[in-house]
């Protein structure tokens, strides 16, 4: 499953972009009361949830494949994993709830504003997941193939 581990750095940016785009479209659609934006937001949310599932699956494989964990990097990974799992479940729940409300024709103005607040909190989860993931790369080089030899140091 090392193949999946190698995909994580390539896959992970799609759900980040999709979920942040969803939040933006949800904000615009709710504030301007434009159905085009809210319908587009629903589609982007669906794609974002699929992306987060793929990111978590590949991230779990990347954790297994990496051999050089120390207590500090593993603690940072645990925070990253916790927020990643929260993000997947949170946005999947929003997708199910939103779909239900739309099907039952209950996705009305007051509900849209409540849903917008829930959506903005989801943005916080995306941010925290990204922050911890970025720290894993920046501090520990996890997910990179950085190789430094003596000739590079002396240049």
Question: Where does each model-flagged region fall?
Answer:
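Polytopic transmembrane helical bundles with strong interfacial aromatic enrichment
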Residues: 1-155
């Amino acid at each position: 499953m090392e193949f999946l581990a190698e995909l994580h750095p390539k896959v992970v940016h799609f759900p980040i972009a999709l979920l942040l785009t969803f939040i933006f479209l949800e904000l615009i659609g709710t504030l301007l009361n434009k159905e085009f934006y809210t319908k587009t937001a629903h589609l982007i949310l669906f794609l974002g949830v699929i992306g987060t599932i793929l990111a978590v699956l590949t991230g779990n494989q990347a954790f297994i494949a990496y051999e050089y964990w120390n207590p500090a990097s593993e603690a940072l990974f645990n925070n990253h994993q916790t927020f990643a799992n929260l993000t997947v479940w949170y946005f999947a729940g929003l997708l199910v709830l939103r779909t239900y409300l739309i099907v039952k024709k209950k996705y009305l103005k007051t509900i849209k504003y409540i849903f917008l607040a829930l959506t903005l909190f989801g943005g916080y989860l995306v941010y925290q997941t990204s922050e911890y993931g970025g720290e894993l790369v920046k501090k520990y080089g996890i997910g990179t193939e950085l190789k430094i030899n003596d000739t590079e140091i002396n240049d």
